[in-house]
């Protein structure tokens, strides 16, 4: 069994497609078909078999999943998370991070005072957006770029932004 720290979320089943048990897979890899080059597992570390059928205009993959053969079976998979082993991923360049490593990181201001944490990382198609949860539990969305986040380490990020805190 694998710890979730050893797994990287790289896709999620969005919905079913058609009557033959096909699913729409939202891949978090770039390009989206790169997910098929990895050994895929579920949260427990059990292998997952996915076969590409086609790709839709949104870049989502239409696939067969394990031995699912009917629409009813496929409907039960909505939201199913797909992982790969961290050790199977390529080494990152300096200033590159996996989203899984940034989630919940401590956020410091320019004077190294803790002001909150990264609550979530979102992408609606125009780039990554960081959802910040401040110490007072309020949240704010900011673009993930060097202007707002000039320093990123494995333990914390520095926020260059005048907050209300």
Curated annotation (Swiss-Prot):
Chief location: cytoplasm
Compartment(s): Cytoplasm
Parts forming coiled coils: none
Listed Pfam families: PRC, RimM
Function: An accessory protein needed during the final step in the assembly of 30S ribosomal subunit, possibly for assembly of the head region. Essential for efficient processing of 16S rRNA. May be needed both before and after RbfA during the maturation of 16S rRNA. It has affinity for free ribosomal 30S subunits but not for 70S ribosomes.
Domain PRC barrel: 94-165
Protein name, UniProt field: Ribosome maturation factor RimM
Gene Ontology MF terms in the entry: ribosome binding
Membership in a protein family: Belongs to the RimM family.
Subunit composition and interactions: Binds ribosomal protein uS19.
A GO biological process held by the record: ribosomal small subunit biogenesis
Domain-related comment: The PRC barrel domain binds ribosomal protein uS19.
GO cellular component: cytoplasm; ribosome
Signal peptide: none
Keyword annotations: Chaperone, Cytoplasm, Ribosome biogenesis, rRNA processing
Native organism: Rickettsia prowazekii (strain Madrid E)
Domain of life: Bacteria
């Amino acid at each position: 069994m694998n710890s979730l720290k050893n797994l990287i979320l790289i896709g999620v089943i969005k919905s079913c497609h058609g009557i033959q048990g096909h699913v729409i897979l939202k891949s978090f890899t770039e390009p989206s078909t790169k997910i098929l080059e990895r050994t895929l597992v579920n949260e427990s570390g059990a292998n997952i078999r996915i076969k590409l059928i086609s790709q839709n205009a949104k870049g989502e993959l239409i696939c067969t999943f394990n031995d699912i053969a009917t629409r009813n079976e496929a409907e039960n998979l909505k939201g199913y998370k797909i992982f790969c082993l961290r050790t199977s991923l390529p080494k990152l360049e300096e200033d590159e991070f996996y989203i899984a490593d940034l989630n919940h990181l401590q956020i410091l201001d320019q004077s190294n005072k803790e002001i909150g944490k990264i609550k979530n990382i979102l992408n609606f198609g125009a780039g990554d957006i960081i959802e910040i949860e401040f110490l007072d539990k309020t949240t704010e969305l900011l673009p993930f770029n060097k202007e707002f986040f000039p320093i990123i380490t494995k333990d914390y990020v520095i926020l260059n932004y005048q907050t209300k805190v």
